[in-house]
Curated annotation (Swiss-Prot):
GO biological process, any: cysteine biosynthetic process from serine
Family of this protein: Belongs to the cysteine synthase/cystathionine beta-synthase family.
Ranges of compositional bias, category Low complexity: 11-22
Organism: Dictyostelium discoideum
Protein name: Cystathionine beta-synthase
Keyword hit for Amino-acid biosynthesis: yes
Pathway noted in the entry: Amino-acid biosynthesis; L-cysteine biosynthesis; L-cysteine from L-homocysteine and L-serine: step 1/2
Amino acid sequence: MSAPEGPSKCTWTPNTTENTPHTTRRTPKKLIMDNILDNIGGTPLVRVNKVSSDLECELVAKCEFFNAGGSVKDRIGHRMIVDAEESGRIKKGDTLIEPTSGNTGIGLALTAAIKGYKMIITLPEKMSQEKVDVLKALGAEIIRTPTEAAFDAPESHIGVAKKLNSEIPNSHILDQYGNPSNPLAHYDGTAEELLEQCEGKIDMIVCTAGTGGTITGIARKIKERLPNCIVVGVDPHGSILAQPESLNNTNKSYKIEGIGYDFIPNVLERKLVDQWIKTDDKESFIMARRLIKEEGLLCGGSSGSAMVGALLAAKQLKKGQRCVVLLADSIRNYMTKHLNDDWLVDNGFVDPEYKTKDQQEEEKYHGATVKDLTLPKPITISATTTCAAAVQLLQQYGFDQLPVVSESKKVLGQLTLGNLLSHIASKKAVPTDAVSKVMFRFTKNEKYIPITQSTSLATLSKFFENHSSAIVTENDEIISIVTKIDLLTYLMKSQQKN
């Protein structure tokens, strides 16, 4: 795998007499498919009605969640494997490795499952559990990596994939960041479908950008056929893909999955994009929910970003013109995220009134707070405590987690039994290693829900829907640990009193 950033290595220029060096393929759908891979491509184009009511132009959505694996990345997963087979690069029995935000991994794992390849996916921790579950069900091996790791760091999903590639015989990284099959899947497939479905009438097309293969492949074909068509790229705040560079604020994290990067992928040709629009998490998730509720489009969060960008960009179009927006993936991957009302509340993606109303419905705690639980002082460890010593404490007290604190008693992170077991079992850590090697770190740029002694038990109860325990702090110093059993004990005692 070459460095994932840098200019495109493609030397072919469209609209010249030069023959394309690329293999082109586009196969119409069969009435009875030989296998599920035949259901990749040929996705529907749907008119957007309610959400676009303020626009003069027509707005239509390319619904890529109708692909076999649920996203636009099924196209490139299939294309990369087929092209690698035909070139002789891979053969049956080989191992495929791919660093991905999830959807490309699902597309690859789907094709690998049908064709009989072993699949290893390296995946940042922020990606949804649903993606992990689907990948595992398809037979892929999953390795999670720190979300905050820079793309060129050895512990990043790209760095780990490269390391595995160097260690595993007959393994290959098909490399969505630099593989020409990525944009070609859209040049030959997605773009041709759009031109056919729209009968050659497209005035604007809006796509989000991750690796950039989708927007590059579509833009190349569209610009060849419709040179006056406006290509709009959508990039989340915190990513650096947009131009001009002044649009990009790198001192910000984002929860939208599958789009944006901290480097410029090789396959992304930004010169093909006429305009960039930046979006944030809140407006994107709210829009995704609107698309579900008002249009019946069961789409993911990045589709919300794309629609936000489309509604802004399409304001420049007039009556009789048409804007196409690409919706990249389905809600299936985010059932516990933006489809979940409580997740939206916890992350500040809904109006405060909703949260207040939700809290008022939980009258069973009668205004009680964490302080009313009368919790014992916590057992803590330092970052230099050995894994072996930590295990002894976990055994002694029957805990499954221990908070890690600094010399000044500030909370640094948490050691969990599950993470410790994973590291020891996979030999990523040994008993004499310090727990700093295996702990979850609480970083300043990560948003956490503070639990203090004044936190209401209603709020704590909601927190426990997604967490097994909470660290109670005051001024960043740990006061106690509270678990679900503490809350249950309080409820039972309260009922006995009444």
